[in-house]
């Protein structure tokens, strides 16, 4: 099985300006992500950016970097541009890896690519078990429910599935076993990425602010299974960055 990894690296970030170039133990964050992705077995790993500073920095460690337009409304639109620039065959599997995950588990990248490869679905993703009750009620932790055939039924910021007896009684009795948190890594068939951006925006997607709901709304399947490796948190804030640096320093001490 061959697959291509695309890592979007936008320079602008409201909470951490210049995020892809943030220094982590002597390397820019985007280089950490790239090196982890290269361990996944991908036939090609490409970084897609919209800023010259990122392009120049990435060019010091790989030639697989593309300059994309600044006016994309979503990450998927940027991905579609990359598919066109690389002239990928419609059946090529493309894994979209977030550029702010320097502790990325390569095993999860290959897992989501394999999950898609072994199905007829146009798209696949991963989840992890929710272990803390507060995450069930945290709208920033996106929950997902799936069917017996590993098809996602729905993604929501709400508490799904709704445990009627526990949630209408004492929450201390809540069993966390059915709850899964969505992990933001996706595998697509290249041809579907181009289809996706032509699909109309769905009311559910707008309500929940979850782009993947557009796929379900239009009747397509998204394959999902639990990640073999529980992913480490990404970097959104200076505090997150400090935690990652501390973690890597302690690991190499």
Curated annotation (Swiss-Prot):
HAMAP family for the chain: KdsB
Gene3D superfamilies on file: Spore Coat Polysaccharide Biosynthesis Protein SpsA, Chain A
Chief site of localization: cytoplasm
Annotated GO biological process: CMP-keto-3-deoxy-D-manno-octulosonic acid biosynthetic process; lipopolysaccharide biosynthetic process
Annotated keywords: Cytoplasm, Lipopolysaccharide biosynthesis, Nucleotidyltransferase, Transferase
Species whose genome carries this gene: Pseudoalteromonas translucida (strain TAC 125)
Role according to the record: Activates KDO (a required 8-carbon sugar) for incorporation into bacterial lipopolysaccharide in Gram-negative bacteria.
Gene of this entry: kdsB
Pathway note: Nucleotide-sugar biosynthesis; CMP-3-deoxy-D-manno-octulosonate biosynthesis; CMP-3-deoxy-D-manno-octulosonate from 3-deoxy-D-manno-octulosonate and CTP: step 1/1; Bacterial outer membrane biogenesis; lipopolysaccharide biosynthesis
Enzyme Commission no: 2.7.7.38
Cellular component GO terms, alphabetical: cytosol
Protein name as catalogued: 3-deoxy-manno-octulosonate cytidylyltransferase
Protein family per UniProt: Belongs to the KdsB family.
Coiled-coil segments on the chain, per record: none
InterPro entries to which the protein is assigned, alphabetical: Cytidylyl_trans, KdsB, Nucleotide-diphossugar_trans
């Amino acid at each position: 099985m061959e697959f291509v990894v695309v890592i979007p690296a936008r320079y602008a970030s409201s909470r951490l300006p210049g995020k892809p170039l943030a220094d982590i133990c002597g390397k820019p964050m985007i280089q950490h992500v790239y090196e982890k992705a290269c361990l996944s077995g991908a036939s090609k790993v490409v970084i897609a950016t919209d800023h010259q500073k990122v392009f120049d920095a990435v060019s010091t460690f790989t030639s697989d970097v593309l300059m994309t337009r600044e006016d994309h409304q979503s990450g998927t639109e940027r991905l579609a541009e990359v598919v066109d620039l690389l002239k990928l065959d419609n059946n090529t599997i493309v894994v979209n890896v977030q550029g702010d995950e320097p502790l990325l588990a390569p095993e999860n990248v290959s897992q989501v690519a394999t999950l898609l490869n072994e199905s007829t679905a146009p798209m696949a993703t991963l989840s992890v078990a929710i272990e803390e009750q507060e995450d069930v009620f945290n709208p920033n932790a996106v929950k997902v429910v799936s069917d017996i055939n590993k098809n996602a039924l729905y993604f929501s910021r709400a508490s799904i599935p709704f445990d009627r007896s526990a949630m209408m009684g004492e929450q201390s009795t809540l069993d966390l076993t059915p709850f899964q948190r969505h992990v933001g890594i996706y595998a697509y068939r290249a041809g579907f990425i181009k289809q996706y951006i032509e699909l109309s925006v769905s009311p559910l997607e707008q309500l929940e602010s979850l782009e993947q709901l557009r796929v379900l709304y239009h009747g397509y399947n998204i394959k999902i299974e639990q990640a073999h490796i529980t992913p480490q948190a990404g970097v959104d804030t200076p505090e997150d960055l400090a935690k990652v640096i501390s973690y890597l320093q302690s690991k190499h001490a």
